[in-house]
């Protein structure tokens, strides 16, 4: 690999590190705890805030993806969405709680639309023979970013800094680690066409993209299956896992952070190992294995709280962490096998739409069970297991042979 290629790959990996700092610290941990435990908002209100952002992302994702397939390329769009996320994150806590929730929603929109473009850039830094390994490295770098963000945030909190100052530090970390991507990624432009389409036409693009996806064997079925496992996983990492550990399990915020830190460490290993194995055995087997491990992990969490076996929470953290790194390393590879390169941005838009609609349904379902029906969070956790079983049944028959 030449010097420019190495620089391009490293810059792409650093961006995964940068945006995972945000994903783990803001929606995954500190903002959710700040909102529920410090400001008195409910799980349902947090879920509705997250879901409102995901509705917008689900509608705009295919438009952004299709736009990124044009001759204008992906990096300009990535820069725009990244700055939207960074600026709104920097301002969290500066104004009223309501304004902060609005800024949180905006930051989620920028982050998730940027991820559509970033994921599609994998074809610029990899080939068919090493794409699983590269995707796994991206996940490993990403969760290394979580460790960096967690370390900085914990250091600041232990030294008396406020949540608001932690939010600002995350925004600055995102900015610093994302900068190389905009200068050094050697983007592979597949299309020579300019795509002129209004953002107001987004819903029409979503419909056309879904119809288009049916032309490629297994793609639509995989996306539907992904909806269900992403629903379960994204519901937890949207912040409700941190709330679950504190409010249901009874851990202190410090103890819950230690478990999440442990999960991050093993997710780095999981992402790399699953990525390497995907190049050998194919992504389908690895995704199915990961789904099974998630079912076991969530079942152990329920057993741990119902029978007061808190040591099992650490087992859950290790198993869940290993597999969250694994499943997100492998499903990117699955997408590239099912999609032609010239439409990769468009179909990653659908991939994002599926993930975001999953993030809409999951928190709403969780809030309905916990706040409306007044059932325990363990019942909500059980509902996520059902979603994982459905996902397994859908994906098990999708072929992952290389097509393009």
Describe these PLM feature segments.
Residues 1-9, 188-224:
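Juxtamembrane intracellular "pre-TM" segments in multi-pass secondary transporters
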Residues 2-54, 218-259:
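Helix-loop boundary and gating motifs at the non-cytosolic
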Residues 48-66, 261-273:
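Central cavity-lining transmembrane alpha-helices of secondary-active solute carriers
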Residues 60-73, 270-283, 370:
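Helix-to-loop junctions at the C-terminal end of transmembrane segments
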Residues 79-97, 293-307:
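C-terminal ends and interior cores of transmembrane alpha-helices
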Residues 113-126, 326-339:
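Intracellular juxtamembrane helix-capping segments at the cytosolic ends
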Residues 133-154, 352-362:
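Glycine-rich segments within core transmembrane alpha-helices of 12-TM secondary carriers
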Residues 156-172, 368-388:
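A membrane-interface helix-boundary motif in multi-pass transporters
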């Amino acid at each position: 690999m030449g010097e420019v290629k190495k620089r391009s790959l490293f810059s792409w990996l650093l961006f995964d590190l940068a945006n995972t700092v945000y994903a783990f610290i803001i929606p995954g941990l500190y903002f959710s705890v700040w909102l529920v435990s410090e400001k008195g908002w409910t799980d349902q209100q947090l879920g509705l805030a997250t879901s409102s952002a995901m509705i917008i992302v689900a509608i705009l994702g295919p438009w952004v993806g299709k736009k990124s397939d044009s001759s204008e390329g992906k990096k300009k769009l990535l820069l725009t969405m990244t700055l939207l996320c960074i600026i709104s994150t920097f301002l969290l806590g500066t104004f009223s709680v309501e304004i902060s929730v609005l800024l949180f929603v905006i930051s989620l929109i920028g982050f998730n639309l940027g991820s559509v473009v970033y994921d599609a850039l994998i074809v610029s830094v990899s080939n068919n023979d090493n794409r699983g390994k590269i995707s796994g490295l991206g996940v490993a770098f990403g969760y290394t970013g979580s460790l960096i963000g967690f370390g900085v945030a914990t250091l600041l909190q232990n030294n008396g800094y406020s949540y608001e100052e932690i939010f600002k530090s995350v925004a600055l970390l995102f900015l610093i680690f994302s900068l190389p991507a905009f200068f050094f990624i050697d983007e592979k432009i597949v299309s020579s066409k300019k795509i002129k389409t209004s953002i107001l036409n987004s819903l029409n693009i979503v419909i056309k993209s879904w119809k288009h996806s049916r032309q490629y064997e297994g793609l639509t079925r995989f996306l539907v299956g992904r909806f269900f496992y992403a629903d379960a996983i994204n519901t937890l990492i949207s912040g409700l896992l941190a709330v679950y550990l504190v409010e249901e399990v009874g851990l202190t915020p410090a103890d819950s952070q230690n478990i999440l830190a442990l999960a991050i460490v093993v997710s780095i290993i999981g992402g790399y190992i699953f990525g390497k194995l995907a190049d050998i055995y194919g992504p389908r087997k690895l995704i199915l294995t990961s789904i099974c491990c998630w079912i076991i992990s969530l079942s152990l969490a329920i057993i741990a709280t119902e029978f007061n076996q808190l040591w099992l929470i650490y087992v859950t953290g290790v198993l869940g962490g290993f597999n969250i790194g694994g499943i997100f390393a492998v499903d990117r590879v699955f997408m590239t096998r099912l999609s032609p390169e010239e439409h990769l941005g468009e179909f990653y838009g659908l991939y994002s739409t599926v993930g975001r609609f999953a993030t809409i349904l999951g928190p709403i379902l969780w809030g309905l069970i916990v706040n409306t029906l007044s059932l325990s969070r363990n019942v909500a956790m059980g509902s996520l297991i059902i979603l994982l079983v459905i996902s397994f049944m859908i994906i098990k028959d999708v072929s992952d042979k290389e097509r393009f």
